[in-house]
Amino acid sequence: MNKLLTRFKASEHGGEYLMRFISAWLCSLILILPFRPISKVFDKEYAGEAPHLLLIIFFAVFYGLLTALRFIPKLREMKTDCAALLISTAQFTVAYAVVMFREKGTSIDFFLGVVLFIALAVWYTVGKHRIRLPKFTKKCWIAVIALSAVFMLVFTALAMAMRYYKLSTPAFDFGIFAQMFENMKDGLGPITTVERNYRLSHFAVHFSPAYYLMLPFYMLFPHPVTLQILQGIFVTSGIIPVFLIARKYGFSLIHSSLFSAIYALYPAFTGGCSYDIHENCMLPAFLLWLIWAVEREKTVPMLVFALLTLLVKEDAAVYVAVIGLYLILSDRSEKTRALGAVIFGAACVYFFAVCAYLNNSGLGIMEWRYKDYMYRGGALITSIVVTAFTNPGYILSNLFTGEKLTFTVQTLGVLGGIPLVSRKIARYILLIPFVLVNLMPTYQYQHSIYFQYVFGSCVLVIWLFIMNMSELSYNRARCFTVFSLIACAVMFMSTMTGYWGNFYDNDYEAHGAVISYLEQLPDNANESITANTFFIPPLYKQKELYTINDRDEPTSESAPPADIVLLDRRNVKFETNYNYFTSLGMKEVTIEDERVACLVCRLEP
C-alpha cells in the first residue's frame, strides 16, 4: 500500500493517473447524455435520475483504453494522457454548451463557469507538459484552412439561404436589399419602396456604392438567395488574409492556420450574418486585406482596399481613419507612416463629405444612436469629443452595462483578453471602433454579436490578437492559441447552435407553395402590393411594394393601401390589419391552393 501511495505521489505518475481519471470521467459524461431519463441536464433533478451504472461502465472502458495506450511502444513518448485531457475538456465544454443553449437559450453563464477549467487544462497540458502535435499534422495546415472555410460557409451562407425558404427573412433589411438589387439589375439604380414606404434610393439612407461589386454575381443568378450566399462568401474569405497576416508575424504554417480556425469560430463573424445581407458584410474581407497590405508595405493594395472599405458605408471611414492614425503613431517605417497619414486624411475628408451629402440630399446620418452623449445645442461629433474630454467618467459608466459586458466577454473574453495587452501604446488606438461603434451607442443592436455592426471593430480585435500574440514567448503563444480555439468553440456553440434550426422545416411544403405564389406576383405589371414583413423578400420583383409596419392603430403611412394586400395569418396583428383594410372597402379574395391560403390572406378593392 505504501509503495502504491509513493508511486501515486510522484509528480509524473500521479499527474498521469489524475489526467486519465478526469479524461475518462468527462468522456463518460458526454456519452450518457443521449440516455438521460429527463429532458433537462441543467436541473438539480438530473443528478438523481442520471444513468449511474452506464456512467460507471463508460468510465471503466475509457480509463482502461487510456491505460492500454501507455503500453503501446510508439505512443509512450506522445503524452497520451495529456492529449486525452485536452481533447476531452474541449469535447465536454462544447457538448455541454450545446445542451445549455437548447435548454436555456443564449447565455454566457456556462462559458464563465468553464473558462477557468479550460485555462487550467490548457496550461497543464500545453504549457507545463508542452504537449505537441504529431509531426504529420504539421503538414495539414491546408486542411485546417479548408475545413474552417467550409464550416463557416455552412453557417454564414447555407444556413442564411435556408432562412429565405422558411419564410423567416423580414422586410428589414433583407426585403429592402432584395428589391434594391432587382432594380439595380433592371438599370433603375439602388431604388426601393420598402425602406420608407415610398420610392427612395437606398443611398439616401446609407451611402454604399460597394454594393455594385455584388451586382455582376446577382445578374448571373438573379434571386434573393444569391445575396445570402454572397454575404457568407465575403465574410468567410477573411480566413485567407488572417492566415497571411499571422505568417507575417512569424507563426508557423500550422499555427497560422489555427488563427484562421479561430476566425471561423469567432462568434461575432458568424453572428453578424444572423439577420441576412447587409453592406457591412464586405468589411471583414476589405479590412483584412488592407491590414495584410499594411503589414507587407504594399502601397497600391493598401490604397485600393482602403478605398473599397470607404465605399462600403459612410461609417466605414472610422475603421480606415483609425488604422491610418495607428500607423502614424506606430514605430513602423517612414513609408508606412506616410501612407497612414494619407489614408487617415482621405478617410476623414470622405466621412465628412458623405455625411454632408446624407444631411443635405438624403435622410441624414443616424446620430440618434448617440443621443445619450449629445448635450443641449451640441452637434454629434463635437458633443462626443467635448464629453470625452470634460466628462470621461460619464462615458465610462455607460460602457459596461449588462448587455455590453456580455458582448465584451463574447468578443474579447474568448481571446483571453490578449487584444487588451500590449507594450506598444499605439496599438490601443485600434480599440477605438470597438468602444465608439459597439460600446458607446444606446442602440442595443450595436453591442450584439447577432448584428452586422460587429464586423469592422472585431476585425481590428483579431489584428490586435495576432500582433500581441507575436510578442509572447513561444510556449505562451501556443497556450493562448489553444485556449482561444476552445473558448471560441464553446462560445460559438453557446450562441450559434440555433442556426441548425434553419436546416429543418416542418412546413416546407406550405412555405414552398407560398414562396412560389408570391414570386409570380403581381398578376398585372402596374399593380402595387402591400404585405406583411416576411412576405416582402419573395415579392422582390415588384416595383411598387410596401411593407406593413404593425401598429395598434394602422394608418396610411404604416400600412399603405395598394391594389393587392397580402396579410400573414401568423402575424399577431392579423385581425387588426384585416379590420383596417376591410374598413377601406377591400375584400378577401379566395386563394385556390389550400397550402397558400392557410398562411396568406389576399385582399383587393
Tell me the role of every PLM-derived stretch.
Residues I108-F117, V318, Y428-Y474:
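Hydrophobic/aromatic-rich transmembrane helices and adjacent perimembrane loops
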Residues I176-S201, P209:
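Extracytosolic helix-loop segments that constitute the early lumenal/periplasmic catalytic or substrate-binding loops
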Residues M1-L26, A60-T156, L339-I343:
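Start-transfer (signal-anchor) and selected internal transmembrane alpha helices
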Residues F62-P73, V225-G250, W289:
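Transmembrane-helix motifs of polytopic, lipid-linked glycan transferases
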